[in-house]
């Protein structure tokens, strides 16, 4: 006798499964199978298997143990109950196989259950039974290969995919292998992914495959130092992106890949390749505009930054400024991207001859950082460089006035951020030397002395520290020797210059010829 609760559940199940017209009759039509499976999943998930199973048995019996229905019930007992009811799952799998011994999903589900129970050998056994039941059922090969892939057995997964290709000539084995190796997140895996993408079944490639394939060449470009090799990788990235764009013209990710590749190629080409740079700038603008149009919520600050570059390369400065302002004012943008955006806005203003707007932009940003104590040397350097660029377009006192503005920024940067103070002093010497070309006024003495004293505290000097110390010694030695006519005072600087750089021609010449020293 059926329990009272079972009767209620059965009634609910039948009502949920059948349309009104069909409820007048028995569950006899297989057209209701998918709806029946869906309803059973809901009932099994929400009720105790002890009460539900007799109802499921009755429904399956009325459907003559339709294999799809039985496997649907088994799947629900295993995946939907929360307790992994293997007893009932296997019970309905057996019913499915009894009804149709070649019904592959029954074997696949059995393999999944054994794999979930960590019995790999049993799982493999049942996957192979599934293949024997139907060698042309592609899902079996994929499921078995992915199980091996998940355990890190990539060679075995490759063998299974190739086995599928042998049985089903249209099976995209190389594409599946490429996808598998792409997910390894290792450079050896990436190289294998590239090899298989090259021979992948193009007709089966989805938009995300083109994006993955293109991304691999972006990663390859980042790993090489040779400029030619970098350009070659970015060109391949663009080629793949454009193939993807042809097939999926509205896909955001392939458009994004095309945008990035075009910007990278443009940046790597020299000024002698002006025509090619224009070509890639046009491509970048095109793909950037389309990516933003199609991306909706996917569009992020990096996309706007790249699109801003494209517009700037196309000399569309007003439009570029607006795009970069989106990045600058975004709450989600990285600080590094905001700094890039601000510099690009300033550069665009400079191209438009609007130095005052660029200066205002930098100073407003600097004021905010000074207020919260986060201002660094490079914040001042940006403004100084702006003044230096402006000075190149001026003459006479106008030029000198702007150079002194740059000098003041370098001085503030050095005073604010001692870690980089040496660069500030170095740039002050350069500016003051350009104002006082013959060094008669000694305008560079103050920063040169500060730089010299700072470098004395650093011990052995290398790289940029060595470079700026050489500059300071040259300035001080020349000033005291030739302007102040004090060889005695100058000697310490020439000696320090030689000590810092024994190959320095000025030091060698002065010490051997003027001081008659043997080096």
Residue ranges and their predicted role:
Residues 488-507, 517:
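C-terminal interaction modules of eukaryotic adaptor/scaffold proteins
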Residues 9-10, 14, 212, 324, ...:
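Terminal low-complexity, poorly structured segments
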């Amino acid at each position: 006798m059926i329990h009272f609760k079972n009767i209620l559940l059965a009634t609910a199940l039948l009502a949920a499964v059948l349309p009104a017209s069909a409820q007048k009759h028995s569950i006899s039509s297989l057209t209701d199978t998918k709806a029946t499976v869906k309803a059973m999943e809901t009932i099994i998930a929400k009720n105790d298997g002890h009460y539900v199973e007799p109802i499921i048995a009755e429904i399956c019996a009325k459907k003559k143990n339709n294999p799809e229905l039985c496997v649907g019930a088994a799947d629900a007992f295993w995946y939907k109950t929360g307790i992994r009811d293997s007893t009932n799952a296997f019970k309905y799998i057996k019913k499915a196989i009894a009804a149709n011994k070649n019904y592959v999903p029954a074997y696949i589900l059995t393999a999944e259950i054994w794999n979930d129970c960590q019995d790999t050998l049993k799982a493999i056994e049942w996957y192979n039974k599934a293949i024997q039941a139907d060698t042309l059922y592609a899902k079996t090969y994929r499921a078995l290969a992915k199980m091996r892939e998940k355990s890190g057995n990539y060679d075995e997964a490759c063998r299974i995919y190739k086995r599928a290709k042998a049985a089903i000539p249209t099976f995209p084995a190389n594409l599946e292998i490429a996808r598998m190796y792409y997910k390894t997140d290792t450079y050896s895996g990436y190289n294998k992914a590239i090899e298989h993408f090259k021979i992948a079944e193009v007709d089966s490639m989805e938009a995300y495959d083109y994006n993955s394939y293109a991304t691999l060449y972006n990663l390859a470009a980042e790993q090489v130092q040779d400029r030619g090799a970098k350009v070659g990788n970015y060109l391949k990235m663009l080629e793949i992106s454009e193939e993807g764009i042809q097939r999926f013209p509205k896909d955001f990710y392939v458009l994004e890949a095309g945008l990035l590749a075009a910007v990278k190629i443009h940046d790597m080409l020299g000024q002698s390749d002006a025509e090619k740079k224009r070509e890639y700038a046009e491509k970048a603008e095109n793909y950037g505009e389309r990516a933003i149009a199609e991306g909706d919520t996917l569009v992020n600050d990096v996309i706007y930054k790249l699109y801003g570059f494209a517009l700037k390369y196309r000399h569309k400065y007003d439009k570029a400024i607006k795009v970069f302002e989106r990045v600058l004012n975004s709450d989600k943008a990285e600080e590094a991207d905001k700094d890039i955006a601000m510099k690009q806005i300033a550069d665009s203003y400079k191209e438009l001859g609007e130095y005052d707007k660029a200066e205002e932009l930098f100073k407003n940003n600097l004021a905010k950082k000074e207020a919260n104590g986060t201002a660094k040397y490079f914040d001042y350097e940006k403004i100084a460089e702006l003044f230096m660029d402006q000075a190149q377009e001026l003459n006479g006192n106008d030029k000198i006035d702007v150079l002194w503005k740059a000098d003041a920024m370098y001085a503030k940067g050095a005073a604010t951020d001692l870690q980089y103070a040496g660069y500030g002093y170095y740039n002050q010497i350069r500016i003051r030397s350009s104002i006082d070309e013959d060094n008669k006024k000694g305008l560079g003495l103050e920063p040169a002395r500060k730089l010299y004293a700072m470098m004395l505290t650093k011990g052995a000097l290398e790289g940029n520290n060595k470079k700026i110390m050489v500059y300071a010694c040259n300035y001080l030695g020349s000033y005291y020797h030739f302007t102040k006519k004090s060889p005695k005072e100058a000697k310490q600087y020439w000696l320090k210059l030689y000590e810092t750089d024994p190959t320095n021609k000025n030091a060698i010449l002065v010490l051997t010829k003027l001081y008659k020293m043997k080096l």
